[in-house]
Amino acid sequence: MKRRVEPELMEEADQALAYTQADFSEPNALFLRLLKELEPGSLAGARALDLGCGPADIVLRFLTTYPLAQCDALDGSAAMLAHAREALDRRPGLARRCQLIQDLLPSDQLPGAHYDLILSNSLLHHLHEPDVLWQTVTHCAKPGALVLIMDLMRPPSAGWAEALVSTYADDAPEVLRNDFRNSLFAAFEPNEVAAQLVQAGIDGLEIAVVSDRHLAVWGRLAS
């Protein structure tokens, strides 16, 4: 099935609210399990970068799991970051270790060779030019940094996409059902992501299908 791009940002208030209120506990928990499989240790003193942080659920999970780490969290949507700020304000102990950044990729607010860990969940499919994500990874990561990028995976047919929408968003508001459907059409296949890594000159990362609708790019960059 051919890729269909979708808007890069969720800027509408109703979109951001529906996304924030949706139950993404299953994929977000999967993301943290995959991170643990990378055996990052305690991450004491480590600084992570979360690209496309949305309402910051993964940021909160990360900071809770790794209490000695810090995280910079970037998103281009002011509406999403407003929900992220509200979530962090409810957890002041975690908020002290997080900096929210509103910007698009490429971002001149992100320092080079600065981060021990690069995280991203559900950003890649939003990007019309996916190379910008991999350029940001190589620019921002320290040598030997850990990388975990998880995203939706484009299904082979429109019927398959509709079945996934029915399975995982059957009771969701229509705005969220439409966003999920559009995101499935906009997502990449594993072989396309592999080609992106080759184009970016990134070695050492593994691509894996990690659910019936997600793929992950993970591993450690060369030192």
Each language-model region and where it sits:
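Conserved alpha-helix/loop element of class I SAM-dependent methyltransferases that forms part
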Residues: S25-A44
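Class I SAM-dependent methyltransferase SAM/SAH-binding core
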Residues: L49, A56-S107
